C-alpha cells in the first residue's frame, strides 16, 4: 500500500494555484480587519444608510403594487368619460321621448270638432295623469239577472242574529 498517505486537498474551482488562493484569503482577512476597526459613529452612520436604502427599496416595491401607471390612469379616465357621455345621451333621449309623449297626449286631449281649433299649451310643470279611472256602471237587480249574474238575497235580521 501507500507509505505516505496524503490528505486530499480540495481546490477552489477556477484557481488551481494554491499560492494565489492564499493571497486572496490574506487580502480578505485584511479587509475584514479594516471593517471591524471602524469607529462607532462610522458604524452607526453606515447602518442607518443601509436601513434607509432597504426602506426605500421596500417602499418602491410596495408603491409599484399600489400605484396606477399613467396608461392605466388614462384608460380609467377614458372609461369614465364614455360613461358620462352615455348618461348624457340617455338623458337627452329620455327628454325627447317625454316631449313626444306630451305632444301625443296634447293631441289626444284636443277636441275633434272643428269649432275648437285653438291649441292648448302644455307647460313642463303641468301634471300628467298616470292612472286611468274606470267608472262602474250602476245596474239594477233586473239588469244583473238579464246579464246572467245571480246573487243571493239579503237576509233580514232575525231574533237569532240579534241575540248574538
UniProtKB/Swiss-Prot annotation:
Cited Pfam families: FAM192A_Fyv6_N
Q: What would be one Gene Ontology cellular-component term for the protein?
A: nucleus
Instruction: Note the InterPro entries from the entry.
Output: FAM192A/Fyv6_N (IPR019331)
UniProt key word Nucleus: yes
Keywords attached to this Swiss-Prot or TrEMBL record, sorted alphabetically, are: Chromosome, Nucleus, Telomere
Regions of compositional bias (Polar residues) in chain numbering: 111-123
What protein family does this chain belong to? Belongs to the FYV6 family.
This protein is called what?
Answer: Protein FYV6
User: Which species does this protein come from?
Assistant: Kluyveromyces lactis (strain ATCC 8585 / CBS 2359 / DSM 70799 / NBRC 1267 / NRRL Y-1140 / WM37) (Yeast)
